[in-house]
């Protein structure tokens, strides 16, 4: 559905041992299937009536396992069910869901419009209890779903296909906790990454949904302040960058380093966010086809030498140090053979290279091309001894 997940993220493959663990746990949970949805803890069920919901084309109100429900079909994944006359800021959202396809249903909250919202969704496979990407939080920012540059915001869950599953979200300020079928929180988001503070609530499919409850203000003591960035005191991360305007890059072409912007006025600061992520999507939104930006920074070295650097990016990268190319690679989820660990997501596991430094200032320039979902970069030195990291002003 255009307003929720225009391109639902595909699914990962996992090692056989993890799959067996997931199947075993899922089978144990499924041994006593729920004939009716589990009772929610607070609030009143919102009936699926025209005065309460705007249902997109193809969404039907049904009775399923003895309760009123809606079915959002696979064919209508780009259509959503929107709750009317609700502006949600903080509180609890609960619902029961039965998946009809591993693609899974999604919940949008703080929905300003189709391009800016917070999103929680499920990839409801039988191995969900072992799969690191069974559930995920990711925001839409400027029309881009940032799922592939935020792999740390996904998790396994006790989700079971072909029966009711109870999902509960508690939203408080910049924090989010998610429970699936009770127990401990399956997902704890220390800092929400979207740009909306309040907005609507809606669902996309495919799936069957029932017992939707919204309890404004019920945050269960969850601190609204964001949790700490675990990398904040790590001096190895390159965080201060300047970014160029966006240019198009023809398919199959490589960027011309000599044609990067030369005038200082064409570059603007783009500091790294949490965990050292340089979020290009937040600045420029959805690329129009294969697009390129340049990022640059200065590394000042006390003496000439070489540092090892870990790098994460989506989708293509070229690294230049003092005008010489030292690294290039591809991390493209669309082509399984070109996916870097972890499964095509942006991570410092994507790659590493030798960073040659001369004594004094060294200009590091990185070209990053993208045409698919999130667009970003991370760079971290293995050892920051003898270097000073600053943004380039040249």
Across the structure, where does each feature detected by a protein language model lie?
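Short carbohydrate-recognition loop motifs
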Residues: 61-79
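Secretory/extracellular carbohydrate-interaction modules
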Residues: 77-142
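Short, aromatic/His-centered strand-loop micro-motif at the edge of beta-sheets
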Residues: 143-166
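Carbohydrate-binding surfaces in secreted/extracellular proteins
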Residues: 160-191, 316-326
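Short, solvent-exposed beta-strand-to-loop segments that form ligand-recognition rims
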Residues: 181-200, 326-339
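Ligand-recognition surfaces built from glycine- and aromatic
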Residues: 194-231, 347-356, 386-389, 393-394
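Extracellular/secretory pathway-exposed regions associated with glycan biology
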Residues: 216-302, 372-376, 380-394
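Aromatic-lined ligand-binding clefts that engage carbohydrates, nucleic acids, or primary amines
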Residues: 306-320, 364
């Amino acid at each position: 559905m255009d307003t929720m997940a225009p391109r639902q993220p595909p699914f990962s493959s996992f090692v056989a041992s993890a799959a067996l663990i997931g199947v075993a746990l899922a089978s144990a949970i499924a041994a006593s299937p729920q004939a009716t949805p589990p009772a929610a803890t607070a609030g009143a069920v919102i009936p699926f009536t025209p005065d309460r919901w705007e249902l997109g084309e193809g969404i039907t109100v049904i009775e399923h396992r003895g309760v009123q429900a809606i079915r959002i079909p696979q064919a209508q994944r780009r259509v959503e069910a929107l709750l009317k006359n609700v502006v949600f800021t903080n509180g609890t959202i609960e619902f029961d869901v039965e998946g009809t396809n591993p693609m899974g249903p999604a919940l949008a909250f703080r929905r300003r419009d189709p391009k800016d919202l917070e999103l929680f969704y499920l990839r409801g496979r039988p191995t969900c209890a072992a799969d690191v990407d069974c559930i995920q939080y990711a925001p839409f920012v400027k029309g881009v779903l940032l799922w592939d540059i935020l792999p740390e915001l996904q998790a396994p869950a006790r989700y079971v296909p072909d029966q009711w599953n109870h999902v509960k979200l508690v939203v408080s300020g910049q924090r989010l906790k998610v429970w699936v079928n009770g127990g401990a929180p399956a997902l704890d988001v220390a800092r929400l990454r979207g740009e909306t503070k309040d907005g609507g609530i809606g669902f996309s499919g495919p799936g069957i949904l029932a017992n939707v409850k919204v309890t404004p203000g019920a945050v269960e003591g969850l601190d609204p302040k964001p949790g700490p960035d675990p990398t904040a005191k790590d001096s190895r991360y390159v965080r201060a960058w300047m970014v160029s305007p966006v240019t198009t890059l023809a398919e199959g072409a490589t960027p011309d380093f000599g044609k990067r912007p030369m005038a200082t006025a064409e570059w603007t600061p783009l500091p790294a966010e949490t965990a050292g992520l340089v979020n290009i999507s937040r600045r420029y939104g959805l690329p129009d086809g294969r697009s390129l930006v340049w990022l640059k920074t200065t590394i000042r070295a006390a003496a000439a030498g070489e540092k090892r650097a870990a790098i994460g990016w989506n989708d293509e990268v070229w690294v230049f140090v003092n005008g010489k190319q030292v690294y290039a690679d591809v991390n493209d989820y669309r082509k399984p053979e070109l996916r870097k660990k972890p499964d095509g997501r942006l991570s410092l596991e994507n790659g590493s290279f030798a960073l040659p430094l001369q004594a004094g200032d060294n200009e590091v320039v990185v070209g990053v091309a993208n045409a698919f979902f999130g667009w970003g970069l991370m760079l971290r030195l293995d050892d920051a001894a003898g270097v000073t990291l600053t943004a380039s002003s040249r």
